[in-house]
A protein has these predicted regions:
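Bacterial N-terminal signal peptides that target proteins for export
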Residues: 1-9
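N-terminal signal peptide c-region/cleavage motif recognized by signal peptidases
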Residues: 17-19
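N-terminal accessory beta-strand-rich subdomains and adjacent acidic, glycine-rich linkers
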Residues: 23-149
């Protein structure tokens, strides 16, 4: 195999691996969609919120999205605006950097509960971000649960 072929193969595999790691989450009500980017090991970000998106729109969300804001901004790391959370760790450090660990979705009566599990990259500090989308009204409920071990 030539060096050029190896380079193309490596680039293709890198592209596939990058796309496999990205996880878009669409939280929808009858007339609205909230789209989040939750890459495993990466930062939770808003991609879009507005009118309900079609499957075609969702497939092209990265190309059209100009909204790339942190969904749960924390104090201490890349937070130019107001932080949703500020923590002073046991060693006195106030830097917190949350990464996506996993995502779970559960169907409930007339609603879908999506939970994004976040963990600090250094400390045993956890945040669960919950979104509950109702299927009979245009309402998305959001709350967090914070834990430390």
């Amino acid at each position: 195999m030539s060096a050029k072929s190896k380079l193309y193969l490596l680039a293709g595999l890198s592209f596939l691996a990058g796309n496999a790691m990205a996880q878009h989450i669409c939280i929808s009500t009858p007339n609205t969609s909230l789209v989040l980017n939750a890459p495993n090991g990466g930062e939770l970000k808003y991609l879009s919120y507005g009118s309900k998106l079609s499957e075609t729109d969702l497939q092209h969300i990265n190309e059209a999205s100009n909204c790339n804001h942190t969904a749960y901004p924390v104090y201490g790391m890349n937070c130019p605006g107001e932080a949703a959370l500020s923590v002073k760790h046991a060693d006195g450090n106030m830097s917190t950097q949350m990464e996506v660990v996993s995502v779970s979705t559960n169907q409930e009566n007339q609603s879908t509960l999506t939970t994004i599990h976040l963990k600090d990259k250094v400390y045993p500090f956890y945040v669960d971000v919950h979104y509950k989308a109702y299927q009979d009204v245009d309402m998305i409920e959001a709350w967090t649960e914070i834990g430390h071990t």
